[in-house]
């Protein structure tokens, strides 16, 4: 039995182009550099777009976006190159101290993330945190002017840092004021790239994972910005059981990709449809009407394979943090 289930795409334009934007700076120190991995790396991002890069090999802070290079004078790069050379040495010392207090040797990492977000409603957030070997170590709470320590070593550092009220207030001010000012400035510099919308392309395929069990995959790719909603529906109702989601990942070309899968018994004759919402367009794929923009391939006994061309967005993901031991780490002036 062959079922033809053409799909309908419903397009609803959003009334606002407001988005959440972020500015983040990441730093990574490595105890045993080698195999092409520098001892120290610092990278800046607006949303998911790389804007700056520094490493211990080049020892230069350099632009990673043309609109950054075109809008910031040479003395900006020279000034922050000097700051980052200082951070490079500080990270090396601090990582050695952490290894000593944890009684660790060999390969270990030390990380820092600082940044801010400008939300769709105009409100702001800020974050500053450290990690050791990819585990949370110290997290700054700008509202209470305090640090959250993740273990006994981190707690020793917390007490020292919290004794310096001036430094705590400085970090709060940087996160809430200076960081947001830089973010707005960078958004203006790169507005053509950062505020564009590229709709997702969507493709559905399948494979038999076990005898009598088929897995349907709905893949969205080539979209920007990264915020996207993608899900499977069974007979018109959203399903969560037997469903697996992939992360929203960069594709390497300034767009994003993601996927969702569902396991099914093709003998049951249920109707499955993939629903995608992205950016300024809301796309709903469901059955019972012809649409020239969709290629529908049908399998027997109610099993459908959809190959769809749509529009979409990607999403960013980052995370890695610290876990400490005895040692006092001094905060320096953040780079921009």
Swiss-Prot record:
Renumbered residue ranges of the record's region Connecting peptide: 290-298
Domain notes: The alpha-1 domain is a structural part of antigen-binding cleft. The alpha-2 domain is a structural part of antigen-binding cleft.
Antigen-binding cleft: annotated span: 19-197
Disulphides: 116-179, 218-274
MF annotations from Gene Ontology: beta-2-microglobulin binding; T cell receptor binding
InterPro entries linked: Ig-like_dom (IPR007110), Ig-like_dom_sf (IPR036179), Ig-like_fold (IPR013783), Ig/MHC_CS (IPR003006), Ig_C1-set (IPR003597), MHC_class-I_related (IPR050208), MHC_I-like_Ag-recog (IPR011161), MHC_I-like_Ag-recog_sf (IPR037055)
Region feature (Alpha-2): 106-197
Organism: Bos taurus
Protein's name in the database: Major histocompatibility complex class I-related protein 1
Annotated GO CC locations: early endosome membrane; endoplasmic reticulum membrane; external side of plasma membrane; extracellular space; Golgi membrane; late endosome membrane; MHC class I protein complex; plasma membrane
CDD domains per the UniProt record, alphabetical: IgC1_MHC_I_alpha3
Keywords per UniProt: Cell membrane, Disulfide bond, Endoplasmic reticulum, Endosome, Glycoprotein, Golgi apparatus, Immunity, Immunoglobulin domain, Innate immunity, Membrane, MHC I, Signal, Transmembrane, Transmembrane helix
């Amino acid at each position: 039995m062959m079922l033809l289930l053409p799909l309908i795409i419903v397009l609803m334009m959003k009334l606002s182009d407001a988005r959440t934007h972020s500015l983040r700076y990441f730093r990574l120190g490595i105890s045993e550099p080698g195999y092409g991995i520098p001892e120290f790396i610092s990278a800046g991002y607006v949303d998911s777009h790389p804007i700056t890069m520094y490493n211990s090999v080049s020892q230069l802070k350099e632009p990673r976006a043309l609109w950054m290079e075109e809008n910031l004078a040479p003395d900006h790069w020279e000034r922050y190159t000097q700051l980052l050379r200082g951070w490079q040495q500080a990270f090396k010392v601090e990582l050695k101290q952490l290894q000593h207090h944890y009684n660790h040797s060999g390969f270990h990492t030390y990380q820092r993330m600082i940044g801010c977000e400008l939300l769709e409603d105009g409100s702001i957030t800020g974050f500053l945190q450290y990690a050791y070997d990819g585990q949370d170590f110290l997290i700054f709470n700008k509202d209470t002017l305090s640090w959250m320590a993740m273990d006994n070593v981190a707690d020793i550092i917390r007490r020292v840092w919290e004794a310096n009220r001036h430094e705590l207030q400085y970090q709060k001010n940087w996160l809430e004021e200076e960081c947001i000012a830089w973010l707005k400035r960078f958004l203006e510099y790169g507005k053509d790239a950062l505020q564009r919308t590229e709709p997702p392309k969507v493709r559905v395929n399948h494979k038999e994972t076990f005898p009598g069990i088929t897995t349907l995959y709905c893949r969205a790719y080539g979209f920007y910005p990264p915020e996207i909603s993608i899900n499977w529906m069974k007979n018109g109702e959203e399903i969560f059981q037997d469903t697996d989601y992939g992360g929203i990942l960069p594709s390497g070309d300034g767009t994003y990709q993601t996927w969702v899968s569902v396991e099914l018994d093709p003998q049951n004759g249920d109707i499955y449809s993939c629903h995608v919402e992205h950016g300024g367009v809301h796309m709903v794929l469901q059955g019972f009407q012809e649409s020239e923009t969709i290629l529908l391939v049908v399998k027997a006994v109610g099993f459908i394979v959809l190959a769809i061309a749509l529009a979409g967005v990607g999403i960013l993901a980052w995370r890695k943090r610290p876990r400490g031991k005895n040692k006092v780490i001094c905060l320096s002036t953040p780079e921009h």
